[in-house]
Amino acid sequence: MDSDLSPQDKKDLDKFIKFFALKTVQVIVQARLGEKISTCSSSSPTGSDWFNLAIKDIPEVTHEAKKALAGQLPGIGRSMCVEISLKTSEGDSMELETWCLEMNEKCDKDIKVSYTVYNRLSLLLKSLLAITRVTPAYKLSRQQGHDYVILYRIYFGDVQLTGLGEGFQTVRVGIVGTPIGTITLSCAYRTNLALVSSRQFERTGPIMGIIIDHFVERPFTNMAHTHPCSYRAPGEDDGGTYAGIEDSQEVCTTSFSTSPPSQLYSSRLSYQTPPLGTVDLCHPTACTGAAHPHQMVVPGKDGGIPQVPAQPNHGTGAEQGRIPSCPTGQPPQLPPPTSCSSEVKTVSPSDVLETTFTRKVGAFVNKATTQVTTTGLDLPFAAFAPRSYDMEENDPMVHPPPSPIPSSPLQGSLHSNNSSHSGGQPNDDFVMVDFKPAFSKDDLLPMDLGTFYREFQNPPQLASLSIDVSAQSMAEDLDSLPEKLAVYEKNIDEFDAFVDTLQ
């Protein structure tokens, strides 16, 4: 297929595909770091600014991508995939999405490699920047912390979608035709985010206590003094890797410093569709009993039935939070790489208190006192305001001043009835303000805009169009008609002579 390409075009196309694959991995992984990325444009781009985009490469990600490619390029039958997964503090994992860069046999031999293919790959990369921030995994990555982390894995070969569970959806980011094939970039993401723990069928007590129903007593009250689990030891370097994780599966480096606990509680999984809410791991024996109006049973991938409550009820947040914990001296057990589970949402009591406090912050929580001084007000012209006043008694909007008496009957007739009586009613909805607008020509007729509009909207009827006047004039014409006809008959010869002159 590439026999028609010149050596230079073939070299350029291979280079474009190679760097596009590397930039694709960078965009996907950086979108799952859990933090917003802001880059500044530059008038003098450097050699690393491929496809006219200022994407700063992470060396570890580039190393993993090159190791996965192993000198190969995505081609026909050879796909490069980036798998995004979630791992909880208890060792449960769940695949979230798989991004696939592949090529099919459909060729576009008339396309120019140096300009057209390069520019279209740039547009496809920009589309990828947008699509990576609208899939469900983006919201999860923004909330990662001590409860779970987001992992990625790069592999080269056949696409593996079995770990996404049933009902996963696919989206095509875009396609770019080349002389050797059509490059296709697509994504398959999980829609069922219910978590099934690998240890939920054990007879030992659960590591974390979750409230199944806020109308029932709190279970596991002795768990309030436990501490959250963590993959990293306290003295471990930030640049280290998690224990038990393969070298090809990197951990986002900012997974533990991006979201405070209060944000984890308030906005966890807010991206989901209305029937799905935050996913909680329930007790094995309590999962069968079920359901509260704010909860929903969602079958897990392995047959489990986790509880999926909707949004937390106001006033019950302190009863629903628990700290994920693990037994002393026992490290978290890691499941096999092929096991799939979903995210566990837990919060500490301090998170609930902080969330409750932030909900009370507002402009209308406490009723303002009646007496207000100018020192407590943020007035733009505080120097011109009175020293002290009462809001209810002296407020001109509540008790408007009486309207001045019109200086002339004509001026008084132009005021509406509602405005003329506004001075005697302290609770009127309208306040009459007398002023002289620019469209009022004389000082004797100062009218507001509403009066001005109403006067011209309903003008008085013309006297010539009056019914009485028109009827009277018609009767007079009928009475004088015989006299006019007699005059015309008398002068008929003159009219005939005038008509002859016109011919």
Curated annotation (Swiss-Prot):
Predominant subcellular localization, coarse grouping: cytoplasm
GO terms, biological process: mitophagy; piecemeal microautophagy of the nucleus; positive regulation of chondrocyte proliferation; protein localization to phagophore assembly site; regulation of autophagy; regulation of chondrocyte development
Superkingdom to which the source organism belongs: Eukaryota
PTM note: Phosphorylated under nutrient-rich conditions; dephosphorylated during starvation or following treatment with rapamycin.
UniProt keyword terms in alphabetical order: Autophagy, Cytoplasm
GO CC list: Atg1/ULK1 kinase complex; autophagosome; cytosol; phagophore assembly site
GO molecular function (one): protein kinase regulator activity
Location of this chain's protein in the cell: Cytoplasm, Cytosol; Preautophagosomal structure
Compositional bias per record (Pro residues), positions renumbered to this chain: 329-338, 398-407
Region (Disordered), start-end ranges: 300-345, 392-428
Compositional bias segments (type: Low complexity): 408-425
InterPro entries according to UniProt: ATG13, Atg13_N, HORMA_dom_sf
Role: Autophagy factor required for autophagosome formation. Target of the TOR kinase signaling pathway that regulates autophagy through the control of the phosphorylation status of ATG13 and ULK1, and the regulation of the ATG13-ULK1-RB1CC1 complex.
Family that this chain belongs to: Belongs to the ATG13 family. Metazoan subfamily.
UniProt-recorded name of the protein: Autophagy-related protein 13
Source organism of this protein record: Danio rerio
